[in-house]
Amino acid sequence: NFGIKYSWEENKIKILPQTYKETSFKVESDWSGASYWFSLLACADSGTFFLEGLKENSLQGDSKIVEIMSHLGIKSTFKNGGVLLQKQQVSGLESWDFTHCPDLAQTLAVTCAILGQNSIFTGLESLRIKETDRIHALQQELAKFNAELKEIKPDVFQVIPSVTMPKQVQIHTYEDHRMAMAFMPLATKTEVFFEDPAVVNKSYPSFWKHCNLAGISTEKIA
C-alpha cells in the first residue's frame, strides 16, 4: 500500500495527483520462469525441485502451470515460502485454453510432444504477434524431433507427439527468449544445440546457470 487513493467504476480507474508513501514489499517470483522447471521435471526420469517465492493464490495468469502440470505428472505442494515439485503418474492433458496464459503455450507444446500427449490447444491467437510468430516457430522446431503442432480447424491446434527421437536436434530461437527456454527440457531425451542461447537474457539471464544446477550439462560452442 503506497497510500494512493483511487476510484474504480466499471472499466475506468480515476487517480488524482497525490504523493506516494514509502513502504517495503516483497515481489512474487515469476511464474513464467517457473514453468520451465515444471516442464523439465515432467520430462525427466526422476527428481524433485523446490521453487522459492511462489504463492498458491497468485494473481499471475501463468500460475495455471500448477493445474496444467498436475495432468502431466507433477504434484505441487506449497510450503516454506515456495512450491515443492514432485513427480507423480501422468493422467493426461486432453485440452487446454491458453487465452489467459499464452506464454505457457510453447512450454506445454514441447512437454506434451515429449511425453506422448495428443493434446488440443486453443487460445493461441496472440502467439502470432509476440517476439516472433510463435505458432510458426513451434511448428518448425517441433518437426525437428518428429512432432507436430497441427491446426485442425481455425485457431484450434493439436499436438502430435514424437514417436522417434533423433540423436541430435538443433533449435533455432527466432530471437525469442521463450523458444530457447521452452525447448530446454528436450535435453532430457537427446542432445540439443541452441542457436543464440543468450536470447534468454531478455527475461531470465541466469537460466543456463540454473540448468546446470538442475543437472543439465551445457557447453558453449564457437
Residue positions per predicted region:
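Short, structured segments at the rim of ligand-binding sites
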Residues: N1-A222
